[in-house]
Design a protein with these regions (language model features):
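Conserved DEDDh/DEDDy metal-dependent 3′-5′ exonuclease domain
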Residues: 1-93
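Generic, well-ordered alpha-helical scaffold segments in large soluble proteins
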Residues: 10-16, 20-23, 32-36, 40, ...
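Short runs of predominantly hydrophobic/aromatic residues within well-ordered alpha helices
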Residues: 7-10, 78-81, 98, 174, ...
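Common nucleic-acid-contacting/processivity interface regions adjacent to the catalytic cores
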Residues: 118-259, 359-383
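Helical catalytic core of nucleic-acid polymerases
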Residues: 221-383
Length: 383
């Protein structure tokens, strides 16, 4: 009979909700509902949005270049389906409105009306109800087709994280590494904090050589970053030592200071550090400092370092950054990448086996998630 009763019924329904979701619900529905319950009922009634009689926790976030306010519903599982769609759809859409996405994915749109929702409510209540029902129906049909909530739930269980945590990459990757280590009966050390600037250079992007060229070729390396990590068996527990980059630091600093280049541009045409190049050239006229893990250091010629790594019978290898890794046992991170890579191959095979477009789309989405896991691990471990 009145708005207060309607909001009370809504709160009753939330009591047994497994997952709360909506389209742009983080930016609109949740803050609107919390504010409305506070105004119509009371602030104390907003505790029903949460568990353990707690109040919703206000939080600010940035979206579309503007700062917005929302609320975290303590103890509840809330996932904004618009953000879920943006995360697991790997091409840009011209619009992320529910109307546009509904038309693209389902061939259905929101119910059109003229004027404001307030005037629609007062002048055509039946259409107002139909408008709201269609919004919910579109969301329900989208998830029945895409199954993104099921996918996020699967990722959450596989990596033992909360369902909303799957919206990011760092926490999921970190927990996946920890879980993989525990499966091998290894204890993971606490995270270490480093003071100062710990930023790393991004990927090298070569400047194009302008003009007409003949015999153009392209090389697309399969899962480049994961493949490099696996090939070198890269991991904190597999590090033997590090060539101190004295020459390289001086060279890069000169490029930045005297030639006014950016840090990334200073590496133009360099495959690896100068120390690495000296080692691979087996130069006996270049002396290097090798810092051992966990402590100690030695002064060796580049030729001696080459022989130590590649000709001493040790199962060692050298990265272009001058880090020596051992490969007598597979590292945690390379082994995790091996697992993900194998799982993706299985999913790609299943995609070929099934016959319907819906089944193919189902497996394609899942193999794409594994691809994102593989390629995002490099960036995630920097954090």
């Amino acid at each position: 009979d009145n708005e207060g009763e309607m909001l009370t019924v809504c709160l009753d329904l939330l009591e047994d909700a497994d997952i709360i979701s909506g389209w742009n619900s983080e930016g609109y529905d949740i803050p609107y509902m919390v504010t409305r319950v506070t105004r119509v009922l009371s602030k104390n009634d907003t505790r029903r949005f949460c568990l353990w009689n707690m109040l919703p926790k206000q939080r600010t976030f940035e979206r579309f270049g503007a700062e917005q306010i929302t609320y975290d519903l303590i103890g509840r599982v809330h996932v904004d389906y618009m953000q879920l769609y943006r995360k697991y759809t790997y091409e840009e859409r011209h619009s992320y409105s529910l109307d546009a996405i509904g038309e693209y994915e389902l061939g259905e749109q929101k119910i059109a009306y003229t004027g404001t929702l307030d005037s629609l409510y007062n002048n055509d209540f039946e259409k107002f109800i139909a408008y709201n029902r269609q919004d919910v129906a579109l969301l329900d049909k989208l998830d029945k087709k895409l199954q993104f909530l099921d996918l996020a739930n699967q990722l959450a269980h596989e990596n033992t994280v909360l369902l909303p945590t799957t919206m990011g990459a760092v926490a999921v990757t970190e927990q996946a590494i920890i879980n993989h280590a525990h499966k091998q009966n290894l204890i993971v050390p606490n995270r270490r904090r480093h003071e100062g600037n710990t930023a790393a250079a991004g990927a090298y992007v070569a400047h194009p050589k302008k003009g007409m060229h003949e015999w153009i070729g392209a090389i697309d390396i399969n899962s480049l970053y994961p493949s490099a990590i696996r090939a070198l068996n890269m991991g904190p527990e597999t590090i033997i030592g590090q060539l101190r980059p004295t020459m390289t630091d001086e060279y890069i600093e000169n490029k930045i200071t005297n030639e006014k280049k950016s840090f990334a541009d200073a590496w133009e045409n360099m495959f690896g550090t100068l120390e690495y190049e000296a080692v691979m050239s087996r130069r006996d006229d270049v002396m290097l400092t090798l810092d051992w893990e966990p402590s100690g250091s030695d002064e060796l010629s580049a030729k001696d370092v080459h022989d130590l790594v590649f000709a001493s019978g040790q199962k060692w290898t050298l990265s272009a950054n001058g880090t020596i890794f051992k490969y007598n046992q597979v590292g945690i991170i390379p082994d995790l990448l091996d697992t993900w890579y194998a799982e993706r191959k299985v999913m790609q095979a299943k995609k070929k086996e099934v016959t319907t477009s819906e089944e193919k789309a189902f497996w394609d989405k899942r193999q794409l998630v594994k691809k994102i896991n593989l390629n995002s691990l490099y960036g995630a471990i920097l954090n």
